[in-house]
């Protein structure tokens, strides 16, 4: 009997030890968000992915062990400084096109993937033939979707004569009206905004922050606790960006650890003598090793451009020639020390003259 008692005691101790050393699910401190518009082979290629291509993306996420999680879950955890599952990805769509419902939703349901649709509400209210109906949106919400704000009319928000009090009041009224329509038709709606065309300025960002909104652009990169929560990036995954060979590198990347809140206003007003080309000054959150500094690379309008380091934490980059009118981006990557993956950051510019 004594031997049995000792055996049970030893077995219990071994069992507890095994639990303590057993591998646990890995966690991460960032999420990469994919951005889609149309799911169709018959719509403008620049903002479209065919149903077959979209199915290929979803299959790749599953095959490679990516954890597709609800955007709200990821945002809540990261804002609180907590971790998300390793290889976390969130799926978003802009514009509430009907082909998202007819072509995209069945594929998403095959994998039980949650997703978010940013809705511009006027086309829904006006029964636009290419937009979803309110019934479709309510159905999507019941089938794993989250609905969020994309303004009422999808108008340009910062291509205006000036950025005075009337402009800001009108812009916020537009956003508030869309929020009210979403809540009236579909119930509780998170205070998230996707900027039409990804365009914003720092005045609008600050106003949205004061009103409790989280906002998303269309520049690329991942989201972490240190991100600018009124200018969150997403990786475009349609059109020229739908190629899995390049998308897989972006999915494996991590947000570059910089002070995103200190980045300059993205609007370059030619009628107000703003500097063009603009200089992007960047402050890293940690001192970087020489190997990382030497391999930091930036691309501007498709051409490589070498940044200049002031010290171990600060660097700047500028185009060699004035940026053209419309949107441009400075995209930069750097190796993560001790890993095969890369840091990624992007800053969008809008060169505009009223």
Give short role names for the model-derived ranges.
Residues 1-87, 109-115, 121-132, 165, ...:
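Terminal accessory/targeting
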């Amino acid at each position: 009997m004594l031997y049995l008692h000792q055996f049970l005691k030893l077995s219990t101790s071994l069992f507890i030890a095994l639990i303590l050393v057993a591998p646990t699910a890995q966690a991460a401190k960032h999420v990469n968000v994919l951005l889609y518009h149309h799911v169709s082979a018959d719509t403008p290629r620049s903002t479209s992915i065919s149903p077959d291509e979209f199915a290929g993306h979803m299959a790749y996420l599953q095959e490679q062990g990516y954890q597709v999680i609800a955007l709200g879950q990821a945002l809540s955890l990261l804002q609180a400084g907590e971790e998300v599952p390793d290889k976390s990805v969130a799926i978003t769509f802009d514009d509430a096109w009907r082909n998202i419902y007819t072509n995209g939703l069945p594929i998403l349901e095959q994998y039980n993937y949650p997703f978010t649709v940013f809705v511009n509400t006027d086309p829904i209210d006006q029964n636009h033939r290419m937009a979803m109906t309110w019934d479709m949106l309510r159905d999507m919400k019941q089938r794993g979707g989250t609905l969020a704000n994309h303004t009422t009319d999808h108008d340009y928000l910062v291509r205006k004569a000036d950025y005075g009090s009337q402009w800001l009041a009108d812009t916020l009224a537009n956003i508030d009206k869309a929020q009210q329509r979403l809540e009236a038709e579909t119930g509780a709606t998170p205070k998230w905004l996707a900027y039409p065309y990804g365009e914003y300025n720092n005045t609008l960002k600050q106003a949205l922050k004061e009103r409790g909104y989280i906002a998303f652009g269309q520049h690329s990169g991942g989201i972490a606790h240190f991100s600018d929560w009124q200018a969150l990036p997403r990786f475009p995954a349609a059109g020229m960006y739908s190629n899995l060979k390049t998308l897989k590198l972006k999915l494996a990347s991590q947000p570059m650890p910089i002070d995103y809140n200190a980045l300059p206003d993205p609007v370059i007003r030619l009628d107000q003598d703003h500097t063009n080309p603009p200089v992007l000054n960047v402050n890293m959150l940690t001192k970087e090793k020489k190997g990382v500094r030497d391999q930091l690379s930036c691309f501007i309008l498709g051409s490589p451009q070498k940044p200049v380091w002031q010290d171990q934490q600060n660097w700047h980059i500028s185009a060699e020639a004035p940026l053209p009118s419309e949107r441009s981006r400075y995209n930069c990557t750097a190796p993560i020390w001790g890993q095969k993956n890369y840091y990624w950051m992007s800053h969008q510019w809008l060169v505009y003259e009223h």
